[in-house]
Amino acid sequence: MNPNFSSMIDRYKHQQLRIGSVSPQQISAWATKILPNGEIVGEVKKPYTFLYKTNKPEKDGLFCERIFGPIKSGICACGNYRVIGDEKEEPKFCEQCGVEFIDSRIRRYQMGYIKLACPVTHVWYLKRLPSYIANLLDKPLKELEGLVYCDFSFARPITKKPTFLRLRGLFEYEIQSWKYSIPLFFTTQGFDTFRNREISTGAGAIREQLADLDLRIIIENSLLEWKDLGEEEHTGNEWEDRKVGRRKDFLVRRMELAKHFLRTNIEPEWMVLCLLPVLPPELRPIIQIDGGKLMSSDINELYRRVIYRNNTLTDLLTTSRSTPGELVMCQEKLVQEAVDTLLDNGIRGQPMRDGHNKIYKSFSDLIEGKEGRFRETLLGKRVDYSGRSVIVVGPSLSLHRCGLPREIAIELFQTFVIRGLIRQHLASNIGVAKSKIREKEPIVWEILQEVMQGHPVLLNRAPTLHRLGIQAFQPVLVEGRAICLHPLVCKGFNADFDGDQMAVHVPLSLEAQVEARLLMFSHMNLLSPAIGDPISVPTQDMLIGLYVLTSENRRGICLNRYTKCNRRNSQTKRSDNSNYKYKKEPVFCNSYDAIGAYRQKRINLDSPLWLRWRLDQRVITSRETPIEVHYESLGTYYEIYGHYLIVRSLKKEIIFIYIRTTVGHISLYREIEEAIQGFSRAGSSDT
């Protein structure tokens, strides 16, 4: 990472960050520093961390102060001190140890590098599926793995001169004919000459092939092949048709990958490393615990392993010219495996473990997953003015309201309450206001109520998979320690009331509050953004509640007709059930009397009753034949239907209409009626 990366983000206010491959020159530029004496530092050459006698970082080691900066601000390795930021202080580097007089926070972003003795493929681009290297080269992954890990070699096609292997024709026959012939040259002193002229193996062979690629030609050829395959007719052979389909999918991926490299100005050979970046030491610390013992990040041990093997390979290539070629290639394979373990431990099979049989955490383990660098500290970090609690159902709440516990509300809105106390001259300063809040004086809750009326809150349930995973609500104070939520908004959150937790946030800026009110309120998000269907629909407990509310006694009107003394029916009831006691169905003039009787426990929720209805002809539009007709002495008569009866006068005029219903039906009807009237009032006020 660039040493000026943090200041660059602050200066330009960048809103995004892109991660990708970089060139060896860029890695060197990030890590290299030039001392006043002209010495260039930045390369980590030694696998050591601290000197045990002095407890100071080893020079050119993994914690070197010359490379990564001073441990203490303004103090070099010699102990000299300079004032940071004072331009009069000269020099800015210690002439003895070469440590720069700078803030120690530089050790959080100053990088180093390891100069690899042989090219090494980046295991993410080779082993992750789909393999980018295999896609670009259009070769089987197993073949490339065998080449990278020195299991076999390629004859160099780059030279037009007649080579020994080409003259002997060893590469024109089966693999067995040359697989055992090349090692005959490995024990000679001219192995380097032989290797540079005749064969290509290891990650260097991959790098050469990637460097020779022309991405535009790859796109053109892949497109032509894709069109040719599309013009072919189906053979009728399912296996062949699938094979053609897979090839077409591969060509599409290859073209997209080549376009991505062209669009981002990334060279394919950068997927093979020549310089290995070394993380800043503060990101892989060594901590001293009780008893003088040291705890080190696993990354340090993996870096040490890479440096040990790389230094061994360097010695074999430089000091011992008579080293057998098989030993050199074996050491190159060890370097490749060490870098693989550093980047992604276990990607090639059995992961590397320490002496306690614990798996080392590689670079991939540090950044991926829920506890990785991105999700834990960059994306999912804790923020101020937020809380978290279990959600419970709040059936009495409006759709756009949520119940906030007092304990959470007073913490979230504490600064606003303090300002309110001071403005109303109820507290002289912040300390007095906090004291009143701790003592939970009644005036505190009154001011809190006023503050909450003007501040929406945001509720979020992880994982936030779509925009309805976070919605705005108007908070109201509730007792207890759980957040109350209207059950109709649960589908958008994919939440239920079996122990789910939700986070609550307070939008502070004016822009955030406007966005919450205009776009994020729950009553404004009634449709699914994906398919447009209603998302605030009754489910689960609400459906059961509606069923119970609208269920009624199963006896039916035919078994208990409206009659003051139907002895035949009552005798039938008594014969069927000895415990049955006939009760005449009550009659009510309005719904308020019926609900009042239910609250007084004179009737049940599902008890059938007769309710006088307003003269609404819609209930008798069906030309239904009455079940019974009862005549009174005064000439009035009753027409009894399935669920209603009509009282008519002698002139056949309708006097009253009674409907047969239950208290549950009445309650549901009143709720629907109030909702319709509310929408009507809202519509009339808007117009």
UniProtKB/Swiss-Prot annotation:
SMART domains according to UniProt: RPOLA_N
EC numbers: 2.7.7.6
Recorded GO CC terms: chloroplast; DNA-directed RNA polymerase complex; mitochondrion
Keywords: Chloroplast, DNA-directed RNA polymerase, Magnesium, Metal-binding, Nucleotidyltransferase, Plastid, Transcription, Transferase, Zinc
Biological process per Gene Ontology, one example term: DNA-templated transcription
Pfam families, sorted: RNA_pol_Rpb1_1, RNA_pol_Rpb1_2, RNA_pol_Rpb1_3
Cofactor(s) the protein needs: Mg(2+); Zn(2+)
Record-linked Gene3D superfamilies: 1.10.40.90, 2.40.40.20, RNA polymerase II, clamp domain (4.10.860.120), RNA polymerase Rpb1, domain 3 (1.10.274.100)
Reactions the enzyme catalyzes: RNA(n) + a ribonucleoside 5'-triphosphate = RNA(n+1) + diphosphate
GO MF, any single term: zinc ion binding
Residues involved in Zn(2+) binding: 76, 78, 94, 97
InterPro entries: DNA-dir_RpoC_beta_prime, RNA_pol_asu, RNA_pol_N, RNA_pol_Rpb1_1, RNA_pol_Rpb1_3, RNA_pol_Rpb1_3_sf, RNA_pol_Rpb1_clamp_domain, RNApol_RpoC1
Subcellular location: Plastid, Chloroplast
Record text on cofactor binding: Binds 1 Mg(2+) ion per subunit.
Similarity comment: family membership: Belongs to the RNA polymerase beta' chain family. RpoC1 subfamily.
Assembly mode: In plastids the minimal PEP RNA polymerase catalytic core is composed of four subunits: alpha, beta, beta', and beta''. When a (nuclear-encoded) sigma factor is associated with the core the holoenzyme is formed, which can initiate transcription.
Protein purpose: DNA-dependent RNA polymerase catalyzes the transcription of DNA into RNA using the four ribonucleoside triphosphates as substrates.
Alphabetical list of HAMAP family matching this protein: RNApol_bact_RpoC1
Official protein name in the record: DNA-directed RNA polymerase subunit beta'
Species name: Ipomoea purpurea (Common morning glory)
Gene: rpoC1
